[in-house]
Amino acid sequence: MKYAGMPFGLWMLFAGSFQKQLTAVLGYDAATARAITKKAKPQYRQIIRRLPEFEKADRFKMNIVNCAMVGAFILSMPQRPEVDSLTDYYARSMMTKPMQWFCRKSGKSKFTAKDIAAMKATAALKAADRNPYSWNMEFYEYPDGSGYEGRFTKCGICVLMKELGLYDLTPALCHLDYTMSEAGGVTNFVRQYTLASGGPYCDCGYKKKG
């Protein structure tokens, strides 16, 4: 994957937040936080370089790029974080003001015909059959009309985290689904299983609020 474009853009958008939360959540002093960030950047570029390019219709490129970023930061920390503290760190690092706005904007189009068509197209694409760093998903609408579920049988984040030697920390990344759903303001996020915790699949259920 080329660094120019989305990987470069997401570093510019989020690196400052990732650095700030090293102090706010993980307790590193400002100098150490700066040193971790400086070390993480080339690490991030290296991870991005060895990823394949994603197909144009694949909506999950941003997910793998964000995984590469948090992976690079973890590998640059003097001490490996616990899952709980990493969950908090990742959520706070990602939920910048622009990201909160993006979640609210996405929330407005949730459950529209366009949204459902896009979900069905994603399910039909089965991108992970050709790219192990992408996702395969099945799409189910709830029969009572209360929402829908994406059921993932292949997960690019699981593959990359395993390669980085960080697989046990993957649940911290899975939890962002709850945070983003909450920020969107229109759905209750429900989940029974994750692949990262040994489940048969990873279900992402979105139920209409109210």
Where would I find each of the regions flagged by the language model?
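Hydrophobic, Leu/Ile/Phe/Ala-enriched alpha-helical segments that form helix-helix packing faces
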Residues: 22, 77, 126-129, 177-180, ...
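Short, well-structured alpha-helical interface segments that form or flank functional binding sites
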Residues: 68, 176, 199
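A short catalytic or substrate-binding loop motif that flags glycine-/basic-rich loops and adjacent residues
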Residues: 131, 197-198
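Short, hydrophobic/π-rich interface segment
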Residues: 138-196
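Short acidic-glycine loop/turn motifs at beta-strand connectors
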Residues: 144, 208-210
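C-terminal edge-of-domain segments
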Residues: 198-208
